[in-house]
Design a protein with these regions (language model features):
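Typically the conserved alpha-helix immediately C-terminal to a functionally engaged Cys/Sec
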Residues: 73-88
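Short active-site neighborhood of thiol/selenol oxidoreductases, capturing the structured segment around
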Residues: 56-69
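N-terminal export signals
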Residues: 6-24
Length: 188
């Protein structure tokens, strides 16, 4: 006959074993950033990345991160772990991951080649995670000031519901009709 102690030990062991199976959490790469397998693998030419995304019927988003950023980790472990959110983003966006203090060379829309850190400074990126969203076409972007090239920006962590709403806001081009706050108010 099973004892209470035996049942408790079994339950604990089963829970512990199940935890190992479910532990498909992303882990940081060599650069200290969490990576999603579906993130855009790029030559870091923003014009080409935007053109490629548009050719595939998608929009371009840049995710700025920083090693050790707790809210970047939260974005990966909570927001991107939600199958519905991840699926919507994969189906509608190309997400380019950049490091706020990184040294990789990136070619901006105006053909200026900068380190990730210099590009972040040019666009006034100060918080991580920050998502930048760009128009469906690169036409005319090089003539605009850096920040004016964006159609939307999400500075800082957004809870999953608002996170998905921000991507919907951009995909549906709701920025042409009003602010993100207006979009949230009208879409629950």
């Amino acid at each position: 006959m099973p004892t209470r102690r035996g049942l408790l030990a079994f339950a604990f062991g089963a829970a512990w074993a199940g935890r190992g199976v479910a532990a498909a959490e992303p882990t940081p790469g060599e650069d200290g950033l969490y990576h999603e397998p579906w993130f855009l693998q790029s030559f870091l030419d923003l014009r080409e990345d935007l053109e490629s995304a548009a050719a595939g019927g998608k929009r371009l988003a840049i995710m700025w991160e920083l090693r050790g950023c707790p809210y970047c980790r939260e974005t990966h472990l909570v927001n991107f772990a939600d199958a519905g959110i991840a699926s919507y983003i994969r189906d509608n966006f190309e997400v380019l991951q950049l490091n706020l203090i990184g040294s990789r060379k990136v070619t901006d829309f105006d053909r200026q080649e900068l380190s990730e850190k210099e590009l972040a400074q040019k666009y006034g990126i100060r918080y991580t995670p920050t998502f930048q969203f760009f128009p469906p076409s690169p036409d005319g972007l090089e003539a605009k000031d850096a920040i004016a090239r964006e159609v939307a920006r999400a500075p800082g962590y957004l809870k999953p519901q608002h996170f998905l709403s921000m991507f919907r806001f951009v995909r549906e081009r709701a920025y042409e009709r009003g602010s993100f706050r207006d979009f949230l108010a009208g879409n629950g």
